[in-house]
Amino acid sequence: MKQVIFKETGLPESVLLLEEAAIPEPRAHESLIRITARNINPSDIMFIQGRYGITPKLPSSAGFEAAGEVEKSEQYPKGTRVIFTAIGTWKEYVCVPTAQLIPTPEGMSDDVACQAFVNPITAYGMLETSGLQKGQWLLITAGASAWGKLVIQMAKMRGIQVICTVRNGAQKQALMDLGATIVVDVHTENLGKIVRAAVETGVDAVFDAVGGEQGAKALACLKIGGRMLVFGLLSLEPIPLNSGLLIFKNLKVEGWWLTSWWESLGQESIKNAIKEVFTYLMTQEVQVDVQEKFALSEFKKAVIAYQKEGRTGKILIC
């Protein structure tokens, strides 16, 4: 089989290699999956760069999220379509613990299935963690990202008002159409001024995917006693925290990682999360964008396309 690996951490376009390997044999608790589609997430790039919360054991395969079909399993018939996460999905076959497989809902395409877990469950989980209620205000950074679009749509269904930031004013109308209340171009508009005009006391919560100065400006938009969940670092810069702001406004800043949150859930909560998120994704009201697809052998083109500014949809490796 073909697989994409890296023997050292660094820029994906520089360190990734395509090699031939034997198809693995599943152990008793595992299933062999033929992968049919993968999407590229920020965590994939950070993992290759050695910047993620999981340290790669070199040489390592890349990719965390995929959709595929069961090839061998003691529990599922051959050909059963499944969704899963694993370390190293940029390959043709992978062995996955059978208990971690999620059957793909009937009618869900591979284009959606291969991105049905990481971003949608993150959006859902952060909304659950925040405790936001109908009528409250949420500010998110990276509003035009796949995660941002899902937060906007899920929040709208809950009656939560969303303000989001973008780096390109051309993206504003599309996000308004999805349900954002206000969209702010951080390159040309004053975020704090716009937020204060809409919500004089400040927003109830902030979800930050960017970090750096943009994260600091978002933090300053919180109301007294507000809460900020930090889950991304797209800027690769730390947030410069204003201690006085934290103290006198009694603000709470927390890290949020999907892996830790998911592991904290009981089985019933996991079932409910999957059911609710997949219901969202299967409704015609929810938009899941794909910009471009590449073959596994075109992985370098895929990572270059992923890193282009102004992208409006996911990059898939099929």
Language-model regions: role of each:
Residues 22-39, 49-88, 95:
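Glycine-rich beta-strand-centered segment in the early N-terminal region that forms part
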Residues 81-143:
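NAD(P)H dinucleotide-binding glycine-rich loop of Rossmann-like/cofactor-binding domains
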Residues 213-283, 318:
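Glycine-rich phosphate-binding loop and adjacent beta-alpha segment
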